Amino acid sequence: MAGVLRLAGAARSPLARALAPAARRMGASAAAAMEDEAYWTEWEEEEEKARARESAPVAEMCPTGGGGGGPQWVVMGRPGPQKHAHAARLAEVLAVPYISMGTLVRQELSPASSLYKKIANSVNEGKLVPEDIIFGLLTKRLEEGYNKGETGFILDGIPRTHMQAEILDEIVDIDLVLNFKCADNCFMKRRFGGDICPHCGQLFDFSKTASSDRNPSLGSCTWPSQVQHAAVLGLEDSRMEKMRAYAEQTKLLEDYYRKQRKLMELKTSARPGETWQGLVAALHLQHLDASPTPHKLTM
């Protein structure tokens, strides 16, 4: 495994050194969206974590890997409690810390924090949290872990864009990126409804053959969710535009890690236990579970 941090001479201002090249490229207006936490409640998170634990017996699990370093992995995909729960569970199994970017930001939403006003103002004004704050918090957390002897991590909530991925590569060596992909259009059906392409957020009109057979933005056939039309549900154009932008950013991010041969895609299921078994199989950790269930996984 790669070293924990690319921070030579960590004792002397490693945070400033690590962020210096990134800051030059970010620009004054660059910002990161920490919106994954807005789609689900803490109660849902705890419920999903409990289900994930039930599907993965602790007694049969032990840390994997050897040598002086642990896995340095990123999880990405549609926001939702199942992704967070399985990422946290995987970190527990591998005996590495689970680092949630959303949690790091929330911890600074305290009047005692020097960043409180900056973050609170961004949130209250509906703006994005500046990337210098995001990567500052992340680098600080990684340095603290390094100083405590941590040798790996599961990172959730960042990167969200191609540029963030490049900045992250300047700070740490990422070994693997687990991409949780919601099967059967479950994200769109659950959150929005409507005849929506799960890849780009495009609305479909089933009265027109072309729209249901081929998505021009992808150049491939699609099978959108056949539920109520989006217009009936009163979906706002701004919401759909956000989903299209999210899809575009995600595709660029996937391509970035695919070119590095670090991307592993996992089709998630409505049943947390099935998703966990698929994750175990994808990572060749079948010995951690007595009855793994095979799933279609691509590397």
Curated annotation (Swiss-Prot):
Coarse class of the protein's main subcellular location: mitochondrion
GO cellular component, one term: mitochondrion
Region annotated NMP, chain positions: 100-129
Record SUPFAM superfamilies: P-loop containing nucleoside triphosphate hydrolases (SSF52540)
Key word Phosphoprotein present: no
Enzyme Commission code(s) on record: 2.7.4.3
Ligand binding (AMP): 106, 127-129, 157-160, 164
Presequence extent in this chain: 1-25
InterPro entries, per the entry: Adenylat/UMP-CMP_kin, Adenylat_kinase_CS, P-loop_NTPase
Presence of the UniProt keyword Mitochondrion in the record: yes
Family according to the record: Belongs to the adenylate kinase family.
PANTHER family assigned: NUCLEOTIDE KINASE (PTHR23359)
Descriptive protein name: Probable adenylate kinase 7, mitochondrial
Protein's organism: Oryza sativa subsp. japonica (Rice)
